[in-house]
Amino acid sequence: MSTQPAPPPEAPSNLLHVQFKNPEFLSYLSHLQSTGQVSLGRDSSCAKFDPAHPLTEHNVMAYFATSPFFDRRSNNEQIRMQNIANGIQNLSGGMGAKQEEQELKRFTGLEFVLVHSREPTCFVVQKRWRTSPTETTPLAAYYVINDSIYQAPDLYSILATRLQSTVYALRMSLSTQRRARPSFDPRRGHHGRFIVADAPTSIDADSNRTCTTQSTHTHHADDHTPQLEHQQDHIHPPPPAAFTQPQLKKARFD
């Protein structure tokens, strides 16, 4: 019986963003099945062979081995190399997924096993570490949907993403509610907050400088006014300014 060392310390690579499809290999499988060079591997009760979806339990693991999700250091690769050395073709007359799973029980280490099949559009492949013929530890899961292979997210990634989305939405809701809440305390009751004027900008400084220059020119022009106007002002003083209401600052209730 072949043995392997303990599982590697590194975590499995995250390929959740990868979608893999091999049209050339699928076309080759369709050609083999349409010409009768390989059995369909389906029960008599299953649907008729569909050239557009040639995957079956018999060839889906060979198709999965062409994807970046497959590990060449696995026991599946060792079995495939042994079959090639013995002249056994995996696609025509070779062992299927069930036979390969039974063969993998003789090894310990990394392996890929077909755990669910609904031909020809849905397959689930599990990556696991085998420590004995009866004990395995799941590491990752992959599913084949309509000839495309994906990596299934683990429970930790799903919960972390959902919790992060929930916390973000809750924080935004509380921030909006905080800005819209009324200002109230038992001692003062409802009260408003005065709006503080913004600091002067460079545009305001230029405007003030222009007004100062204009007032200076006006003052020089008034120096040439006849003294008669000043005497008339002393004789007939201007009427008192009309009473104006005090200006109130605008307030907003937060």
Curated annotation (Swiss-Prot):
Short name of any one Pfam family annotated for the protein: Med6
Keyword Nucleus part of the UniProt annotation: yes
Protein species of origin: Mycosarcoma maydis (Corn smut fungus)
Compositional bias ranges of the Basic and acidic residues kind: 219-236
Main location: nucleus
GO cellular component entries: core mediator complex; mediator complex
InterPro entries: Mediator_Med6, Mediator_Med6_sf
Entry keywords, A to Z: Activator, Nucleus, Transcription, Transcription regulation
Disordered as annotated region, ranges: 205-254
GO function terms (MF aspect): transcription coactivator activity
Family: Belongs to the Mediator complex subunit 6 family.
Protein origin, superkingdom: Eukaryota
Protein name from the UniProt record: Mediator of RNA polymerase II transcription subunit 6
Job description of the protein: Component of the Mediator complex, a coactivator involved in the regulated transcription of nearly all RNA polymerase II-dependent genes. Mediator functions as a bridge to convey information from gene-specific regulatory proteins to the basal RNA polymerase II transcription machinery. Mediator is recruited to promoters by direct interactions with regulatory proteins and serves as a scaffold for the assembly of a functional preinitiation complex with RNA polymerase II and the general transcription factors.
Assembly mode: Component of the Mediator complex.
Subcellular location as annotated: Nucleus
Gene it is expressed from: MED6
